[in-house]
Regions:
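Active-site/pore-lining binding-face segments in mid-to-C-terminal subdomains
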Residues: 197-255
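Active-site neighborhood of phospho(di)ester-bond hydrolases with catalytic His/Asp-centered motifs
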Residues: 37-40, 61-68, 89-91, 146-148, ...
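Metallo-beta-lactamase
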Residues: 98-145, 151-220
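Active-site metal-binding motif and surrounding structural segment of the metallo-beta-lactamase
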Residues: 45-90
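Conserved beta-strand hairpin/beta-sheet module of binuclear metal-dependent hydrolase folds
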Residues: 1-55, 59, 156-166
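C-terminal regulatory/interaction regions
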Residues: 239-309
Length: 309
């Protein structure tokens, strides 16, 4: 495929500190076929529509959702009003939550608080406009169920380009390297996340789009870093399990900063983006802690002995 047919549309939130170069929507235009990946939250739909019009987009054939979290899919229903010919592709587990999003919105408000309000309420998607397909459109886009970040997560392969969503976590460019961290909110299961990563590695993509953030030319390197990070971070959670709850997160962060080169690059992030990442870190660690703390003593000990490749 011709990667010149790709365009990134940044969906910044000026009202929130550090919410720049974080949320993005990706546009692909082939021969008579137009696809948008992750339209973002409701509050950025007006900007997204202006950018699509500026780029000369008159119709969307498909809207592909990597998952249904509010910052990726919350604006889908509103976007359909502007592009009534589009069909939405979503993980089968996520469809009902977008058709009737009341519980999804309630959960988003509970977890994110004021940030959910900044994203905007989730607009329902008509049931006849949303579904799942393993192969999409004349470009032959392939959809893969990749639970881990969420049970309703999908990745999409367009030629040799992988739209990875958050299967490999979050990344940012920093001077002289990259910052990366896992994205493992509660209901995280290590084995499930590793299986999804292994299947994406087996596809051997040549380019990869992170939902957060950017396109990379070394996807296998990034996928392997993400896999090693999961193993390392879960080991850290296991090794700090005996520390009192009030001190555990602080101790775990110190443990990680000593051992994880990519996470240690947090210090190279701009101050506002660093604050944003610290905000989301708590949810990542909670997901891992809930997973590890539910294991038996023997299982936790085995995790403590695991080493990344």
């Amino acid at each position: 495929m011709d990667h010149a047919d790709l365009a990134c549309i940044d969906l910044d939130l000026p009202s929130r500190e550090g919410f720049r170069k974080f949320i993005s929507s990706w546009l692909y235009r082939g021969d008579g076929f137009t696809v948008l990946v992750d339209p973002g939250p409701l509050s950025t739909v007006p900007w997204l529509c202006r950018e699509l019009r500026r780029l000369g987009v008159e119709r969307l054939d498909h809207i592909l959702l990597t998952h249904i979290h509010i910052d990726h899919a919350g604006g889908t229903g509103a976007l359909l009003r502007e592009f009534p010919g589009a069909a939405v592709i979503c993980h089968p587990e996520g469809i009902r939550h977008l058709v009737a999003p009341e519980k999804l919105w309630e959960g988003s408000r509970k977890v994110l608080g004021a940030l959910a309000e900044a994203y905007g309420e989730i607009v329902p998607v008509p049931a006849e406009r949303i579904g799942f397909a393993e192969t999409i459109g004349p470009a032959g886009i392939r959809a893969f169920l990749t639970p881990g970040h969420a049970q309703h997560h999908c990745c999409y392969l367009l030629g040799d380009l992988l739209f990875a969503g958050e299967v490999a976590g979050v990344r940012c460019d920093v001077p002289g390297g990259i910052f990366m961290r896992p994205a493992t909110p509660p209901r995280f299961v290590l084995e499930v996340a590793l299986d999804s990563l292994d299947r994406m590695i087996a596809l051997a993509p040549r380019r990869m789009v992170f939902a957060h953030y950017g396109v990379v030319e070394t996807p296998l390197q990034h996928l392997r870093i993400a896999r090693n990070q999961l193993l390392l971070w879960v080991r850290g959670v296991a090794e700090t399990a005996a520390i009192e709850p009030a001190r555990r997160e602080e101790a775990l962060v110190a443990w990680l900063l000593e051992r994880d080169e990519q996470y240690r690059n947090e210090c190279r992030l701009p101050q506002d983006i660093r604050a944003r990442e610290r905000y989301f870190l708590g949810n990542t660690l909670r997901g891992m802690m809930e997973y590890v703390d539910a294991l038996s003593d023997g299982e936790r000990q085995a995790l403590g002995e695991m080493r990344p490749a």
